[in-house]
Regions:
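ABC ATPase "signature
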Residues: 258-259, 267
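Conserved ABC ATPase "signature" region
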Residues: 30-39, 94-103, 140, 144-147, ...
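A short, proline-enriched helix->beta-strand linker immediately N-terminal to the Walker B motif
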Residues: 192-196
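Conserved ABC ATPase signature
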Residues: 173-177, 181-183
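ABC ATPase NBD coupling module
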Residues: 40-44, 99-121, 268
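Helix-to-loop junction immediately C-terminal to a conserved catalytic motif
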Residues: 81
Length: 325
């Protein structure tokens, strides 16, 4: 899991409302009353995207937006780069090294273009690759649009292909690659731009489970090396708990709980969240602190309170001595 740089915010959502329709403002009073999406649509004809969403995301963090289909997670994600309109509230984005907060919904066309080219990159569920181009041409496409030097682009593409294990496929057409390999090309293209913020909208959900697991591992490896800020959309709880340093769970366009995987598993904020976590495997989430009490038996082997339970089980299998926190 990526560890956030403390007190170094890079994306902020402040009471964000997104409504689709010809008269979105007509839905605001009903949002304030806590009405549901179906109630708002029946009364106003407008479709609620997200309601009163507030989040602060730190540089280097992996935050997962999770929920069922239609919960608003992709809608909120696409507000970061101005793809979905914010009717009320504010989204602000900061580029590391630039002491400037920029609102993609209230900035000039030139500033928005700069944000999309240099600050924020995006990976979709559908790979969006150009089939008439080679693998290396697809990886370098964002750099080409940004007008980067050809020699520098070639070197950057070479580095990214090596990172995702596709160096030997650089000259191949993307149509010759499997789905998993094509998504690696999408990852390489996103990371090649060096944009500090990466938006990932269910990028692995259409893949076979084995390939999906492998790409999750590869993403974590890339993140450990490149340390980007990632906002990742998923409807898969195991995926969310594996990737996210924090998880924001959404229901009906609203954020119902945001916390670490351990916090969400141990203290679900609502029956909806409790139902999500009821059948998950807790071994990757819980630590010794959660399952052991502090004792002081002499001669007992001690472990740190944050030792994962999975590691603790292996230690118990390797010793007949007591283990204490």
């Amino acid at each position: 899991m990526a560890k956030a740089v403390k007190n170094n915010l890079i994306v902020k959502f402040e009471n964000v409302d997104i409504v689709f329709g010809d008269k979105p403002a007509s839905a605001l009073s009903m949002i304030d009353e806590g009405k549901t999406r179906s109630e708002i649509q029946e009364a106003t004809g407008q479709i609620l995207g997200v309601a009163n969403c507030s989040l602060e995301i730190e540089e280097g963090e992996v935050l997962v937006l999770m929920g069922l289909s239609g919960s608003g997670k992709s809608t909120l994600l696409r507000a970061v780069n101005g793809l979905n309109p914010v009717i009320r509230g504010k989204v602000e984005v900061r580029c590391p090294g630039i002491e400037e907060w920029r609102n993609p919904h209230d900035c000039s066309t030139a500033d928005l273009r700069e944000m999309r080219l240099d600050w924020v990159s995006m990976v979709f569920q559908q790979f969006g690759l150009l089939p008439w181009r080679t693998v290396e041409e697809n990886v370098g496409f964002g750099l080409e649009l940004a007008g980067r030097d050809k020699a520098q682009t070639k070197e950057k593409v070479r580095e990214q292909l090596k990172l995702v294990g596709l160096s030997d496929w650089s000259g191949k057409q993307v149509s010759e690659l499997s789905g998993g390999m094509q998504q690696r090309v999408g990852l390489a293209r996103a990371f090649a731009t060096e944009a500090p913020i990466l938006l990932m909208d269910e990028p692995f959900s259409a893949l076979d489970p084995l390939i999906r697991t492998r790409l999750q591992d590869e993403l974590l490896d890339l993140q450990r090396e490149l340390k980007r800020t990632i906002i990742f959309v998923s409807h898969d709880l195991d995926e969310a708990f594996k990737l996210g340093g924090r998880i924001a769970i959404m229901e009906g366009g609203r954020i119902v709980q945001c916390g670490t995987p351990r916090e969400i598993f141990s203290n679900p904020a609502s029956p909806y969240v409790a139902e999500f976590v009821a059948n998950m495997n807790p071994l990757g989430v819980l630590t010794a602190r959660d399952v052991m009490g502090p004792v002081g038996g002499e001669g007992a082997q001690t472990v740190a309170a944050e030792t994962p339970v999975d590691d603790l089980i292996h230690q118990l299998g390797d010793t007949v001595a007591e283990i204490a926190v």
